[in-house]
């Protein structure tokens, strides 16, 4: 019987792919990571150790899967939509001595928190305000075509502490096109700064742990890849719902090269755009001639919280879409979701007496 962290002899990954006649599908943006040294590096940077539980998204032929099992994970659940990969993954599961479970599902439609919901042996939950992280991980070498919608889905779940994040600040390690990875981690005033920069950095601390050359993949993509590790923040940096902040960020970054006021006005009907956008900028003390990439997290927090107040004052405003010329607040105010989603409320953090440990948005540095 294999030891807890050692797999029995297996065919080399290239031979494995040839054995099962696996070819990457361009339509699914599939690229196989062939170098086991790199897959082991991903598992190492994800900080997988013995006894940990792991969910892997999109294992494909199982390169990272092997590395996770070698690292000593006591349970590994893989989520794979492509039925061609199920037989080779079953081969790995048989070699893994009952540590590996296969879920033949679409990751975008899978609530990964349900995978362990009824597992009484899962690692203990850890309070969100605790400095320790749960002995759980989510890892994935994502197809490029689902990477952005999937990370938004997971960041939203983090913000509501649902899914696997009901168990605590479960870290997330994923691969992205290098340009997307840079956007996720982009500091203020960088050309790579975007909506996804704010959405990731307000609820987590993303860090690009290393880059992978496109030459390491088969077939070779036209871009390099960045591996990003996300550690959820103990306290989000914005006090609104995920949806309110996302809408503000989407509109503000819509005109990246224009003054911030131009994007902000698209949040409002034409008859209110000047009044409400001016009021919001004045309240937030933001120069209307600045650009979106020069706004920090604290300023986006002010904008989102101010816009949330306006949406409560003007029912239906949250549902307003400037591209729909038929939208009017009177009709929208009668819709079931006329008011914005409420701010998530969680147990307060333990009181900190030390002045040195006082948390402040002003101390935030996204670089």
From Swiss-Prot:
<protein>
    <recommendedName>
        <fullName>Dimethyladenosine transferase 1, mitochondrial</fullName>
        <ecNumber>2.1.1.-</ecNumber>
    </recommendedName>
</protein>
<keyword id="KW-0808">Transferase</keyword>
<keyword id="KW-0698">rRNA processing</keyword>
<keyword id="KW-0804">Transcription</keyword>
<keyword id="KW-0489">Methyltransferase</keyword>
<dbReference type="GO" id="GO:0003723">
    <property type="term" value="F:RNA binding"/>
</dbReference>
<feature type="binding site">
    <location>
        <position position="106"/>
    </location>
    <ligand>
        <name>S-adenosyl-L-methionine</name>
    </ligand>
</feature>
<feature type="binding site">
    <location>
        <position position="58"/>
    </location>
    <ligand>
        <name>S-adenosyl-L-methionine</name>
    </ligand>
</feature>
<dbReference type="InterPro" id="IPR001737">
    <property type="entry name" value="KsgA/Erm"/>
</dbReference>
<dbReference type="InterPro" id="IPR023165">
    <property type="entry name" value="rRNA_Ade_diMease-like_C"/>
</dbReference>
<feature type="binding site">
    <location>
        <position position="33"/>
    </location>
    <ligand>
        <name>S-adenosyl-L-methionine</name>
    </ligand>
</feature>
<comment type="function">
    <text>Probable S-adenosyl-L-methionine-dependent methyltransferase which specifically dimethylates mitochondrial 12S rRNA at the conserved stem loop. Also required for basal transcription of mitochondrial DNA. Stimulates transcription independently of the methyltransferase activity.</text>
</comment>
<dbReference type="GO" id="GO:0005759">
    <property type="term" value="C:mitochondrial matrix"/>
</dbReference>
<dbReference type="GO" id="GO:0006391">
    <property type="term" value="P:transcription initiation at mitochondrial promoter"/>
</dbReference>
<feature type="binding site">
    <location>
        <begin position="30"/>
        <end position="33"/>
    </location>
    <ligand>
        <name>S-adenosyl-L-methionine</name>
    </ligand>
</feature>
<feature type="binding site">
    <location>
        <position position="31"/>
    </location>
    <ligand>
        <name>S-adenosyl-L-methionine</name>
    </ligand>
</feature>
<keyword id="KW-0949">S-adenosyl-L-methionine</keyword>
<dbReference type="InterPro" id="IPR020598">
    <property type="entry name" value="rRNA_Ade_methylase_Trfase_N"/>
</dbReference>
<feature type="binding site">
    <location>
        <position position="141"/>
    </location>
    <ligand>
        <name>S-adenosyl-L-methionine</name>
    </ligand>
</feature>
<keyword id="KW-0805">Transcription regulation</keyword>
<dbReference type="GO" id="GO:0031167">
    <property type="term" value="P:rRNA methylation"/>
</dbReference>
<keyword id="KW-0809">Transit peptide</keyword>
<dbReference type="GO" id="GO:0000179">
    <property type="term" value="F:rRNA (adenine-N6,N6-)-dimethyltransferase activity"/>
</dbReference>
<feature type="binding site">
    <location>
        <position position="80"/>
    </location>
    <ligand>
        <name>S-adenosyl-L-methionine</name>
    </ligand>
</feature>
<dbReference type="InterPro" id="IPR011530">
    <property type="entry name" value="rRNA_adenine_dimethylase"/>
</dbReference>
<dbReference type="InterPro" id="IPR029063">
    <property type="entry name" value="SAM-dependent_MTases_sf"/>
</dbReference>
<dbReference type="Pfam" id="PF00398">
    <property type="entry name" value="RrnaAD"/>
</dbReference>
<keyword id="KW-0496">Mitochondrion</keyword>
<keyword id="KW-0694">RNA-binding</keyword>
<comment type="similarity">
    <text>Belongs to the class I-like SAM-binding methyltransferase superfamily. rRNA adenine N(6)-methyltransferase family. KsgA subfamily.</text>
</comment>
<dbReference type="InterPro" id="IPR020596">
    <property type="entry name" value="rRNA_Ade_Mease_Trfase_CS"/>
</dbReference>
<dbReference type="GO" id="GO:0034246">
    <property type="term" value="F:mitochondrial transcription factor activity"/>
</dbReference>
<feature type="transit peptide" description="Mitochondrion">
    <location>
        <begin position="1"/>
        <end position="16"/>
    </location>
</feature>
């Amino acid at each position: 019987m294999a030891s807890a962290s050692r797999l029995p002899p297996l065919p080399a990954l290239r031979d494995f792919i040839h054995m099962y006649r696996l070819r990457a599908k361009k339509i699914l943006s599939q690229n196989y990571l062939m170098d086991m040294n790199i897959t082991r590096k991903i598992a190492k940077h994800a900080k997988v150790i013995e006894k940990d539980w792991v969910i892997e998204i999109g294992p494909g032929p199982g390169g990272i899967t092997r590395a996770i099992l070698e690292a000593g994970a006591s349970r590994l659940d893989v989520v794979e939509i492509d039925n061609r990969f199920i037989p080779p993954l079953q081969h790995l599961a048989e070699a893994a001595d009952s540590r590996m479970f296969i879920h033949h599902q679409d990751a975008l439609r899978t609530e990964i928190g349900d995978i362990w919901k009824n597992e009484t042996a899962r690692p203990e939950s850890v309070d969100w305000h605790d400095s320790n992280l749960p002995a759980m991980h989510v890892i994935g070498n994502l197809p490029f075509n689902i990477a952005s919608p999937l990370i938004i889905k997971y960041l939203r779940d983090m913000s509501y502490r649902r899914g696997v994040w009901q168990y605590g600040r479960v870290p997330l390690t994923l691969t992205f096109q290098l340009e997307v990875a840079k956007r996720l981690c982009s500091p203020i005033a960088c050309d790579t700064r975007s909506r996804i920069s704010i959405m990731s950095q307000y609820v987590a601390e993303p860090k690009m742990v290393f880059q992978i050359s496109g030459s390491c993949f088969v077939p070779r993509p036209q871009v390099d890849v960045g591996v990003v590790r996300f550690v959820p923040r103990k306290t989000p940096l914005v006090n609104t719902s995920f949806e309110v902040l996302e809408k503000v960020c989407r509109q503000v970054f819509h005109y990246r090269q224009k003054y911030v006021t131009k994007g902000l006005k698209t949040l409002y009907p034409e008859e209110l755009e000047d009044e409400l956008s001016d009021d919001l900028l004045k309240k937030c003390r933001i120069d209307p001639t600045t650009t979106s990439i020069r706004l920090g997290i604290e300023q986006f927090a002010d904008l989102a919280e101010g816009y949330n107040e306006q949406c409560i004052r003007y029912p239906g405003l949250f549902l307003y879409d400037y591209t729909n010329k038929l939208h009017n607040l009177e009709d929208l105010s009668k819709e079931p979701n006329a008011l914005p989603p409420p701010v998530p409320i969680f147990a307060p953090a333990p009181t900190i007496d030390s002045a040195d440990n006082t948390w402040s948005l002003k101390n935030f540095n996204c670089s």
